[in-house]
Design a protein with these regions (language model features):
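Leucine-rich repeat
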Residues: 1-29, 34, 39-45, 52
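Hydrophobic alpha-helical signal peptides and transmembrane signal-/tail-anchor segments
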Residues: 144-164
Length: 174
């Protein structure tokens, strides 16, 4: 492979600051993406001139295997924003794959609440784009988080009540 002879080729920048990784991720070349990342994981740090990185572009195109490979290398990549403040989740809801939306939410649940520079979360974008199936995926995810937080809150309340009851018994006994 060319990279064995000249590793610097992986950082060659084309139009709009597009690297081989960004181009491969956009076009759906999973094997190329994996090979590039195995040679140089720092390629994940490079964004195009508009701030979009390989994850943004693969998410928009619905390339599930590439999104998974990128997130496996760096789950924090899901939080990175472009110049409009959009995450890969914002891009995915405009795209074609509900599975990519799920992968991003599983990688970092907090991104569901992140607004872009115009105040739009991914749910707002899905609604505006009339992406009903994506809206449902996000809504179900939010409901599962809500159930989790209700359970956690219940556990905390029970624990606090138990501690308070124990404290009251000690005070009463003294």
């Amino acid at each position: 492979m060319l990279l064995d002879h000249d590793p610097g080729l992986s950082k060659t920048v084309g139009q709009s600051n597009a690297t081989p990784l960004i181009t491969a991720a956009t076009r759906g070349h999973t094997a190329v993406v994996k090979e590039l990342l195995s040679k140089d994981p720092s390629l994940l740090e490079i964004s195009r001139s508009n701030g979009k990185n390989a994850l943004h572009l693969a998410s928009r195109q619905g390339h599930e295997d590439i999104v998974k490979a990128l997130l496996d290398k760096d789950p924090q990549l899901a939080r990175r924003t472009d110049k409009k403040g959009q995450t890969a989740l914002h891009m995915a809801v405009k795209g074609v794959s509900c599975e990519v939306v799920r992968l991003l939410l599983e990688a970092d649940a907090a991104i569901v609440m992140l607004p872009d520079k115009f105040g739009n979360t991914a749910l707002h974008v899905a609604t505006r784009k009339k992406r009903a199936e994506v809206y449902i995926v996000i809504a179900k995810f939010l409901c599962s988080l809500y159930r989790y937080f209700l359970l956690l809150t219940t556990i905390i309340i029970i624990s606090l009540n138990f501690m308070l009851f124990s404290l009251m018994r000690r005070v009463k006994l003294s």
